[in-house]
Design a protein with these regions (language model features):
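Helical "lid/coupling" subdomains associated with nucleotide-phosphate turnover
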Residues: 7, 21, 43-85, 93, ...
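Short coil-to-beta-strand
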Residues: 31-39, 88-92
Length: 457
């Protein structure tokens, strides 16, 4: 069996940290396979927020982060031994998102220092210092993840996917618009190595499910019960969420300046929703995503590891279910979900925010992103066995960056899809194939700032 190279991407999010372990094979071509992923709660930001579940609360912030991450790295090492995957010396790329963006700079730096120390003390290799992802980079990785897993990185614009992602602290959108006008803040020009596409890729801080829910409740000045609290009222909740979103956009509170303009989605472009988009659909359809509407004409590239197409409801279909969901008490919602609460995306702590989440998705999609009521949004927990996370996009990006550093020319990325045969992405548009020896020469450690595969227009 050919030797495979191992690399780990850790998504240090606001609610928890998820590690993705990838392997690559073949001496001439890079093959990408996600061996497994694992999540640990709470997130690293809990060390600065002094949340009760954070380890070593009595210690300093850096020590808390080191202990938090050390537990995850220990579990990864054990998993590598159990699954007979060679992980000693594997590079670890830790990238933090909105949870750390929301912290004070000194707290953020302390957490990243503690994370770096944990990696150095493990059997893995620290070749790229932990850092906080700018929101635009997270959005770019979302786009790369979906289109790499679906096999459309080298496709014409009309065949690529627009990607919406909602975490706990922020929300992202990324797609290739029909016009690459610099007047739209957030336009990024990919390098020729990545096909030279002009993408719109932005993040809005504070529009993640957890942050938005807390903000919407804090703004309440009405009498009686807040309509977003279960049992609540969907129409009232949507109005409150809409007012919050409009105010944040007008005040420039999301990090994009005041009243940022969004380019229109190209007609016919398929939209994919990740993370809490999937959670919302699970909650809306009784914990079983297969009950939600889908579209038989949807591209097969979006199928999961066993070939099932994802649910793809329209906004009106979501709203019809949201009116029912928001009227539930928390106990009634749990009964409605029944045994389906075993789904890893249906965490108990999310359920009180389900009404807000559904309203937020509708408001953002309709009022900010311009999604029409006829457009279906395919919501995916995984695509061909790859977890629905920006981590795969980051891995593809790192590979392409290594190509730029070494001047290597490849013939494309082969995405190895468990149970599904590999698909070769057109090398003329995505020259990121690498010899494994080239990866070793690169050391897998070039910081992203050294080689930009995109530029801001």
């Amino acid at each position: 069996m050919a030797t495979r190279t191992t690399a780990i991407v850790i998504d240090a999010g606001s609610s928890g940290s998820r590690a993705h372990l990838y392997t690559f094979g073949a001496p001439q071509l890079t093959t990408i396979r996600e061996e497994w992923s694992m999540k640990r709660w709470p997130g690293l930001s809990a060390c600065a927020l002094k949340e009760p579940k954070a380890p070593s609360i009595e210690a300093n912030i850096s020590g808390c982060a080191r202990k938090n991450l050390s537990h995850m790295l220990h579990d990864l090492e054990a998993g590598c031994r159990t699954k007979s995957v060679h992980c000693v010396g594997a590079p670890v790329y830790l990238r933090a998102t909105a949870g750390l963006r929301l912290l004070q700079p000194q707290d953020r730096e302390s957490i990243l220092q503690g994370a770096a120390e944990a990696i150095r003390q493990s059997s893995f290799r620290l070749t790229s210092l932990p850092r906080t992802l700018p929101g635009s980079e997270e959005a770019l990785y979302d786009w790369l993840m979906v289109n790499a897993a679906a096999g459309t990185l080298g496709a014409p614009r009309s065949a690529t996917f627009a990607v919406l992602d909602m975490g706990g602290g922020s929300t992202q959108i990324a797609f290739e618009p029909a016009s690459a006008s610099p007047s739209f803040q957030g336009m990024q020009q990919l390098s020729s190595q990545m096909g030279g596409r002009a993408l719109y890729a932005v993040s809005r801080l504070g529009f993640g499910m957890n942050e938005a829910h807390d903000s919407v409740l804090a703004r309440w000045r009405g009498a009686g019960r807040h309509p977003c609290k279960l049992p609540g009222d969907y129409e009232g909740c949507r109005k409150e969420v809409s007012a919050f979103v409009r105010a944040a956009e007008e005040e420039g509170a999301t990090g994009l300046g005041r009243q940022p303009r969004t380019p229109p989605l190209p007609p016919g472009m398929q939209v994919v929703g990740l993370d809490n988009f999937y959670f919302a659909v699970l909650a809306l359809w009784g914990g079983d995503a297969s009950r939600a509407p889908t579209d038989a004409a949807m591209p097969a590239g979006l199928a999961d590891a066993v070939g099932r197409l994802p649910p793809a409801p329209t906004l009106p279909e979501m709203e019809a279910r949201a009116r029912r969901l928001c009227a539930f008490s928390e106990d009634a919602l749990k009964l409605d979900l029944g045994g389906h609460t075993r789904d890893k995306k249906l965490k108990a702590e999310k359920l009180p925010k389900a009404c807000t989440c559904a309203a937020l998705i509708v408001v953002l999609a309709r009022e900010v992103y311009g999604v029409t009521d006829e457009q279906r949004i395919a919501v995916a927990a995984d695509i061909h066995g790859f977890d629905g996370s920006w981590a795969l996009g980051a891995m593809v990006y790192e590979i392409a960056e290594g190509t730029g550093q070494n001047g290597l020319v490849g013939v494309g990325v082969i995405i190895v899809r468990p149970i599904v045969r590999p698909i070769i992405v057109a090398g003329a548009l995505l020259l990121v194939g690498l010899a494994v020896s080239g990866l070793r020469r690169a050391g897998w450690g070039w910081p992203l700032s050294n080689v930009r595969l995109y530029s801001v227009l």
